[in-house]
């Protein structure tokens, strides 16, 4: 995670254009988006989540869904319990606000064959710890909704660097 002052200065930039920006409300909002996007992922469908994703993420998801369909695979994410929602980075760039959130959750994550229902990957009984960085963006000043613009694993460099 970025040093506190770097994060704080990014949040200050966002607040300069949108004084109503509130960290706690933002965390609640993105946690809601997290659940909605995960549900879309499980359904292998962009329908209903399209407006929550940037064009690049839409294309990425569509590609992943196509691959899963071709392989006859369904990725199941169940009993999702979000443990922590932490702001990791915030900045403005090219007229947009960006905030990266570090999600820590426990969930059942397994993949089944969509013909037989047989588990081909993962474990449907033992929850795993899930940690990912999700970056959300919107027009500076709050003129548009927050959308998911990137997903990174811990250890990967974040998209902007």
Regions found by a protein language model. Name each.
Residues 1-6, 96-100, 111-161:
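Short beta-strand edge/turn micro-motifs at domain boundaries
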Residues 2-82, 86:
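Core segments of small alpha/beta cavity-forming domains
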Residues 73-115:
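Surface-exposed, charged secondary-structure patches
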């Amino acid at each position: 995670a970025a040093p506190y002052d770097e994060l704080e200065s990014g949040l200050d930039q966002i607040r300069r254009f949108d004084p109503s920006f509130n960290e706690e409300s933002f965390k609640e909002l993105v946690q809601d988006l997290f659940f909605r996007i995960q549900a879309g992922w499980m359904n292998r469908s962009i329908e209903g989540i399209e407006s929550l994703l940037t064009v690049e993420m839409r294309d990425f998801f569509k590609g992943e869904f196509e691959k899963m369909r071709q392989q006859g695979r369904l990725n199941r994410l169940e009993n999702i319990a979000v443990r922590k929602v932490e702001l990791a980075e915030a900045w403005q760039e090219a007229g947009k606000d960006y905030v990266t959130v570090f999600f820590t959750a426990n969930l059942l994550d397994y993949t089944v064959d969509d013909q037989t229902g047989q588990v081909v990957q993962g474990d449907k009984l033992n929850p795993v710890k899930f940690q990912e960085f999700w970056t959300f963006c919107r027009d500076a000043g709050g003129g548009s909704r927050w959308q998911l613009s990137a997903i990174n694993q811990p250890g990967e460099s974040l998209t902007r660097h």
